[in-house]
Amino acid sequence: MDTPVILFGAFDRHNFGDMLFPHVAAAMLPDREPIFAGLAERDLRAEGGHRVEALSAVAAWLGERPATLIHVGGEILSCDAWQAAVMLAPPGEAQRLVARLDARPHEQREWAARMLGTDARAPYATAARAAFRGPLRIAYLAVGGVELDACDEALRAEVLAALAAADDVSVRDRRTQAQLQAAGIAARLAPDRQ
């Protein structure tokens, strides 16, 4: 039995650009049938996306079996839990949440942790390792973090630790690559023809 491959990213929301990433990543794995996972379960097939499983459900289903998880594209390195949770909320609710909690960072973090089921500060970039009980190979494919240097120190430290522990890292822009290199993390530029 092949080790399951999980494509994980911010394609669990209605954003056309983010919904393209798993199509490209799946095409790079022609002999595999990847599992598409996000922070939330969504069925975006009607919009050209995928049926996306919640990461926590995929981890529970796999139990202690080994897996490979590929973080797929997007500006996930600097996307904090509050931003991720608001993006996953229904549009009307998102506007009310922002109005109510905009100047309350502590309450934002508490609400986001409840909504997402994780305390990760940058959940699209760092929640995977803690979710799985079995051996997990982790790769980052063409991820971005142009604003990582502007994020708070705790988020930056969490992201850099996750990247340092990864089996492979590629980024989508030179600025992110330079920031990671300055932190001692080697990251290839993908696509590599830029």
Short names for language-model regions:
Residues 26-30, 174-181:
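Class I S-adenosyl-L-methionine
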Residues 167-171:
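A short beta-strand/loop micro-motif in the catalytic core of glycosyltransferases
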Residues 1-162, 194:
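Aromatic- and Gly/Pro-rich donor/ligand-binding loops
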Residues 134, 165, 183-185:
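Short, structured coil segments at secondary-structure junctions
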Residues 18, 173-174:
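Helix N-cap/beta->alpha junction signal
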Residues 177-194:
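Helix-loop-beta element that forms the nucleotide-linked donor phosphate-binding surface
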